[in-house]
């Protein structure tokens, strides 16, 4: 199928200038993230996480951001999943927030590290009960024989934990991505898009405009 005729011009925003940007990329991320939330787009905290296997093969998946601050970006997962196994071998990852409806993207490059278990527990206890049970029931990234197998395991776990709080699995928790580069992209007419790259140095952050 030839889809070369599918195209869309970008006219949503005025040109982005360096003086419009915050000196700190986390502050700039917060401003754009709030704009995304206020715009009403679906799951503005959704991003694409890229990891690399030991053989050099990259893989990607959609993940939900659950916290960000000056220390970085936090997400949660099964520590036996493909993404976690790849992070254990190569902690360098990238995160992309593809806000197509807003004609904006943010790309984060950094190193992933496990967060303290008590922090994972605090978040786990805020999850809906079904999601807590799901964390126990799903052997994430492993081969399973059918959906019925998964649903039966979920029902068994629900019965097991029918009394009291559901404990945090030993194999489940969070990662924090500590960024060393963050790029902000904003669409402009004639494909003359705005791109600014923040890079971390010993003295803080530098920012430079990059050609689209």
Swiss-Prot record:
Complex formation: Homodimer.
Catalytically driven reaction(s): pyridoxamine 5'-phosphate + O2 + H2O = pyridoxal 5'-phosphate + H2O2 + NH4(+); pyridoxine 5'-phosphate + O2 = pyridoxal 5'-phosphate + H2O2
Residues that coordinate or bind substrate: 66, 123, 127, 131, 191-193
Residues at which FMN binds: 61-66, 76-77, 83, 105, 140-141, 185, 195
Pathway info: Cofactor metabolism; pyridoxal 5'-phosphate salvage; pyridoxal 5'-phosphate from pyridoxamine 5'-phosphate: step 1/1; Cofactor metabolism; pyridoxal 5'-phosphate salvage; pyridoxal 5'-phosphate from pyridoxine 5'-phosphate: step 1/1
EC number, as in UniProt: 1.4.3.5
Cofactor note: Binds 1 FMN per subunit.
Keywords in alphabetical order: Flavoprotein, FMN, Oxidoreductase, Pyridoxine biosynthesis
One GO term (biological process): pyridoxine biosynthetic process
Name by which UniProt lists this protein: Pyridoxine/pyridoxamine 5'-phosphate oxidase
NCBIfam families noted in UniProt: pdxH, PRK05679.1
Transmembrane segments: none
Family to which the UniProt record says this protein belongs: Belongs to the pyridoxamine 5'-phosphate oxidase family.
Role summary: Catalyzes the oxidation of either pyridoxine 5'-phosphate (PNP) or pyridoxamine 5'-phosphate (PMP) into pyridoxal 5'-phosphate (PLP).
Cofactor(s) annotated in UniProt: FMN
